[in-house]
């Protein structure tokens, strides 16, 4: 489906997705994909805030999708925009070269923009990174200096207790997208271990392509059920705190204020 996307598809679909976000109370969203100039246009026309980036994907079969240079130019075009701000969207440690991630980290520190990436989301990723680099995602991110940028890490399901301690030193932002990741057969992230260590956790919807909808209130309901199951205690997780943090902490992480949804 991704290979079939073109500019017209994106422009027709973005207002629908943004409208669904607004209906569930979201006034600021993040998106890392293709044709993000179209996403920016749609956000301006509707009047919501957005934090956007082209998605850099290099290590897969087919032509690469965008580059760090393209991403930099896109971010520069948004510097004076009152509604739309740039992100640095490198897809993942398994689909982008180490060199590009290091360049993205330099750009992040120099421009004050967050890196966004998928992180520790599947057992296949863990296996691939061990085979390629001899390290887990957390070990790899620490080794190359990625964690110093305090990136936005989507999912972060397969992280050991020892690695949570490593993350706690840097306090990256964790995007928790429960419905999508569980529907793929991946595990349930131990969100309380992050929260207890002071690592900011933000609710996300992932996308209409993978989740089927983008309703942050639905994701809060799934989070409550999933975390209750994970810890075998239905009152273990506070959904009100999760929503509150998603608004306050999430909005601040983007540099555009309150009202975040990924």
Q: Language-model segments: which ranges?
A:
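Alpha-helical scaffold segments that flank or form the walls of functional sites
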Residues: 1-47, 70-80
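Alpha-helical segments flanking ligand/cofactor-binding loops in enzyme cores
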Residues: 19, 41, 102, 106, ...
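A structural motif
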Residues: 24-26, 48, 112, 171-172
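Divalent metal-coordination and catalytic microenvironments
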Residues: 25, 43, 88, 118, ...
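Structural detector of well-ordered beta-strand residues that form the stable sheet scaffold
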Residues: 29-30, 51, 116, 152-154, ...
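Metal-coordinating catalytic core of metallo-dependent amide/deamination hydrolases
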Residues: 38-157
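Catalytic core of soluble alpha/beta enzymes
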Residues: 121-145, 149-169, 182-193, 207-218
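His/Asp/Glu-enriched, well-ordered alpha-helical/loop segment
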Residues: 143-150, 192-262
């Amino acid at each position: 489906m991704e290979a079939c996307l073109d500019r017209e598809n994106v422009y027709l679909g973005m207002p629908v997705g943004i409208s669904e976000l607004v209906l569930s109370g979201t006034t600021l969203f993040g998106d890392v994909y293709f044709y993000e100039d179209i996403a920016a246009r749609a956000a301006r026309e509707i009047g919501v805030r957005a934090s956007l980036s082209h998605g850099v994907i290099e290590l897969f079969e087919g032509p690469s999708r965008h580059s760090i240079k393209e991403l930099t130019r896109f971010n520069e075009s948004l510097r004076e925009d009152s509604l739309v701000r740039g992100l640095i969207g490198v897809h993942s440690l398994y689909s982008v070269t180490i060199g590009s991630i290091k360049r993205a980290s330099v750009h992040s520190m120099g421009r004050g923009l967050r890196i966004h990436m998928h992180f520790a989301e599947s057992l296949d990723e863990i296996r691939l990174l061990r085979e390629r680099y001899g390290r887990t995602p957390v070990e790899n991110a620490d080794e190359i200096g990625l964690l110093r940028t305090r990136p936005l890490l989507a999912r972060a399901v397969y992280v050991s207790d020892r690695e949570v301690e490593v993350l706690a030193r840097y306090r990256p932002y964790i995007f928790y997208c429960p419905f999508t990741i569980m529907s793929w057969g991946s595990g349930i992230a131990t969100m309380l271990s992050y929260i207890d260590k002071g690592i900011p956790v933000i609710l996300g919807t992932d996308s209409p392509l993978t989740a089927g909808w983008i309703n942050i209130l639905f994701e809060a309901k799934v989070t409550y059920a999933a975390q209750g199951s994970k810890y075998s205690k239905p009152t273990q997780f506070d959904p009100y705190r999760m929503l509150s943090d998603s608004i306050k902490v999430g909005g601040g992480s983007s540099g555009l204020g309150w009202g975040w949804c990924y």
